[in-house]
A protein has these predicted regions:
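Short, intrinsically disordered, charge-balanced linker/junction segments flanking boundaries
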Residues: 224-227
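A short linear-motif detector with a strong N-terminal bias
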Residues: 8-9, 21-22, 42-44, 168-171
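Proline-rich intrinsically disordered, low-complexity coils
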Residues: 10-12, 25, 53, 79, ...
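Acidic catalytic cores of enzymes that act on phosphate-bearing nucleotides/polynucleotides
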Residues: 140-220
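Metal-dependent phosphoesterase core characteristic of DEDDh/y 3'-5' exonuclease domains
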Residues: 1-2, 22-132, 138-141
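Glycine-rich, highly charged phosphate/nucleotide-binding loops
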Residues: 6-17
Length: 227
């Protein structure tokens, strides 16, 4: 507290300075896991100080992008040219400090704000150099409108989905079929993971599927139902 009082500035002033930087027209805010963490902290800070928490990321041609998802996609789809890091169980690790070390990128004081900034920039440059087409594709499709053009729920055209929710053991990657747009959230689409057993999805009624959805996994396994 003493150091903050001596060197810091009031939070409303701090939030205004961040807003000014993030609101420069036609810029993209990028980080490493920023969409799930840093951006949420930014939004909370803006909201707490009576600033629109979303406007900075879309107004005046602005956007946001998360390098972590690009790194995961690079590992799963175009791994050549990057030295990948693994944990003790042999699973791929996407921790920034491990990847920078594996690729000879200086990253002292990991999790120090500025050190992480320079490390993130270096990893982005590395992927752009080694896999330029992948980098460009993901950059051009960082926005919702571009992604919507790829989604065909009428034909349920399969898509490659990359997400940390899928797990490192499967490269955070899976084929999915878009089934329908979410009824209440226009930014979400309901998909089917095609890497699993979809027989139940094809043969059961909506009522039975709903019951299975809220049944314990152990009970489903006892009945021989795959989840």
């Amino acid at each position: 507290p003493q150091e903050c009082n001596e060197k810091g500035i009031p939070e409303p002033e701090f939030a205004a300075k961040i807003l000014a930087e993030f609101s420069q027209p036609n810029t993209c805010v990028m980080g490493y896991n920023n969409i799930r963490y840093d951006d949420e902290m930014t939004r909370y800070t803006f909201y707490r100080n009576f600033i629109d928490p979303y406007e900075y990321s879309w107004k005046n041609g602005n956007s946001r992008w998360d390098l972590l998802d690009l790194v995961r996609a690079c590992y799963a789809l175009r791994p050549e040219g990057i030295n990948w890091a693994y944990d003790d169980d042999g699973m791929p690790s996407f921790r920034l400090e491990k990847l920078t070390k594996a690729n000879g990128i200086e990253h002292e004081n990991a999790h120090d704000a500025m050190a992480d900034v320079y490390a993130t920039i270096a990893m982005a440059k590395l992927i752009k150099e080694k896999q330029p087409k992948l980098f460009q594709f993901f950059f051009e499709h960082r926005g919702k409108k571009e992604i919507e053009k790829l989604i065909d729920t009428a034909e349920m055209t399969p898509l490659v989905h990359v997400s940390g929710m899928l797990g490192n053991y499967r490269g955070n990657c899976a084929w999915v079929a878009p089934l329908a747009w979410h009824p209440t959230n226009q930014n979400a689409v309901i998909v089917c993971d095609l890497s699993g057993d979809i027989d139940n999805l094809l043969s059961k009624s909506a009522v039975d599927l709903r019951q299975d959805l809220y049944t314990k996994k152990s009970e489903l396994e006892e009945r021989g139902v795959s989840s």
